[in-house]
């Protein structure tokens, strides 16, 4: 399932899991079926992730990637090396990555955004 801030979310891990790899192969294997159920976000109120997003990337039930990127690129951004919306998500918060791991992952994604913006990919 996708969270309002477009990070995967599930009932067991919340947003604190990572997709590692996708393999494309010409085989006869059946694709894995999606996990049945409903997104934990469906019943979440008052949706603390929405109010925690300083970049106003989550409004009117839609994620605005341009707002997210614009805010992350600001020199004074609170989201350069983290995501305030993700930190505010109450679903399985006990699985939250430690601060060093969060800073590491978000620093890499910020570097990719900067490279994309400047055309230096």
Spans of model-derived segments:
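Catalytic cores of enzyme domains
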Residues: 1-119
């Amino acid at each position: 399932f996708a969270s309002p801030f477009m990070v995967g979310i599930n009932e067991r891990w919340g947003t604190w899991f990572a997709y590692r790899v996708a393999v494309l192969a010409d085989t006869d294997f059946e694709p894995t079926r999606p996990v049945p159920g409903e997104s934990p976000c469906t019943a979440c109120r008052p949706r603390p992730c929405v109010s925690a997003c300083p970049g106003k990337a989550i409004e009117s039930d839609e994620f605005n990637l341009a707002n997210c990127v614009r805010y992350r690129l600001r020199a004074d951004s609170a989201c350069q090396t983290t995501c305030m919306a993700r930190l505010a998500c109450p679903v399985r918060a006990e699985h939250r990555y430690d601060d060093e791991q969060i800073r590491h992952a978000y620093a890499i994604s910020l570097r990719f955004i900067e490279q994309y913006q400047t055309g230096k990919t």
